[in-house]
Amino acid sequence: MDITFIRHGHGEHLIDYPNRLNELHPGLTERGKSQVTKLCKQLKLDPHDIILVSPTRRTIETALLLSAGEHLTICPLVGPRMFPQNPVFTPFICDQIYSREELDTQFPGLSVMDCGLECWEEGINRMDEHQFEVLARGLLQWCREQDGNIYIISHDGTITNYRILLGEKGLSRRDFLGEAGMHTFKNF
């Protein structure tokens, strides 16, 4: 079984960068949709595969283009997370996740993972490192127990944090995947 991290396509918050980083719930641009369509040709999704998606509009739109909504589960534990973490950094509004109520309204019928915690307000963006590590390791263990491959559609900082948890060393912002980029761990 493999685990593949996919970064969402080009988002509206990156138009006129950095002036739109405080835009709430930006979606994909036409460029972002085109990037995801190209990525779709590289993926071979199996009926047993599972797609975990950050609760933001741009990641959900990415997932819907890749999967037509099949095997897709929204999971706050793969929501936006700063990298590197710094308590003096202020989170951008573009990284605010949808509430469960907003998800039900905006994307009715999508499955939402019950993580057994109340992280729908703040998400994992500024979560304490130890708490994040405990929750993330729990999610990774859950992934290992599934039958198919796992695809996680998320954000640069989040993906980099998970890559470190999975044993990669010396990662920096230079290692971000870029728009609609992907990184696979074989035999996860």
Tell where the protein language model's regions lie, with residue ranges.
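Short catalytic/ligand-binding loop motif for oxyanion handling, primarily in non-cytosolic enzymes
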Residues: 12-15, 59-62, 81-84, 121, ...
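Domain-level recognition of soluble alpha/beta enzyme cores
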Residues: 167-188
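Generic beta-sheet signal
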Residues: 3, 49, 146-156
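Conserved histidine-centered catalytic loops in small-molecule metabolism enzymes
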Residues: 46-77, 101-115, 167, 186-188
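A short, acidic, amphipathic alpha-helical segment used as a generic capping/interface helix at domain edges
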Residues: 131-146
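Active-site metal-binding loops of divalent metal-dependent hydrolases
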Residues: 9, 156-157
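Phosphate-handling substructures
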Residues: 22-30, 68-135
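Active-site-proximal alpha-helix that buttresses catalytic centers in soluble enzyme cores
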Residues: 2, 6-74
